Regions:
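Disordered inhibitory propeptide/activation segment of secreted metzincin zinc metalloprotease zymogens
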Residues: 1-33, 83
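Metzincin-family zinc-dependent endopeptidase catalytic domain
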Residues: 1-6, 36-161, 166-176
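Generic preference for flexible, low-structure residues
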Residues: 27, 145-146, 180-181
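Short, intrinsically disordered, charge-balanced linker/junction segments flanking boundaries
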Residues: 174-186
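Ser/Thr-centered flexible coil motifs
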Residues: 31-38, 183-186
Length: 186
């Protein structure tokens, strides 16, 4: 933070990932973000900038913290995506995982291939960027460990009706974000 109360983040769309990097994350099958994914990631970042004192600039490094985006096709059982907080946690910083976010792209999970406004791929981008901003899930659960369900929620309002960081549908709290057959998410 530069004393102005605004966090200036930089980001990069990865063009490659070493085998060591992939092993560190427990994933396989790197691929670059498509132009569609890049555009939707920028819009998801703008969603955060609209409600928080944070800016995002695409460049190789710099800013208060740095984020990266990449795709993977295997590993991280149960996770459609995952991300790490940039630069503030020694565990992540020394391991080289800080600020990284990864999105599952394969034949059995296609939501991240064509993210767009009002679909789960776009919601996933917004959610994972939230993790890089330091936000956690409203409850103690994680798709990478076990098979969490709404029964694991710590409080009744732990749904996407109240937080983009929740795993659980707004239907669990008698809300409905479906308009004309389309889910209206971040």
């Amino acid at each position: 933070v530069d004393g102005n109360g605004i966090i200036d983040l930089t980001y990069t769309f990865l063009t490659s990932a070493s085998q060591a990097t992939m092993n560190k994350h427990g994933i396989t099958g790197f691929s670059q973000f498509s132009n569609l994914q890049k555009g939707q990631a920028v819009l998801a970042m703008q969603s955060w900038a609209d409600v928080a004192k944070v800016t995002f600039t695409e460049k190789a490094s710099g800013g208060d913290f740095h984020m990266t985006f990449g795709n993977y096709s295997g590993g991280q059982d149960g996770a459609a995506a995952f991300a790490y907080l940039p630069g503030t946690n020694d565990k992540y910083h020394t391991s080289g995982t800080d600020g990284t976010s990864w999105y599952l792209i394969n034949n059995s999970y296609t939501a991240n291939i064509n993210p767009g406004l009002n679909n789960y791929g776009r919601q996933t981008l917004t959610h994972e960027i939230g993790h890089t901003l330091g936000l956690d899930h409203p409850g103690d659960y994680n798709a990478g460990t076990g098979n969490p369900s709404y029964r694991d929620a710590d409080y009744g309002q732990d749904t996407r009706g109240y937080s983009v960081m929740s795993y659980w549908s707004e239907f669990n709290t008698n809300q409905n974000f479906t308009k004309g057959g389309v889910e209206a998410y971040a």
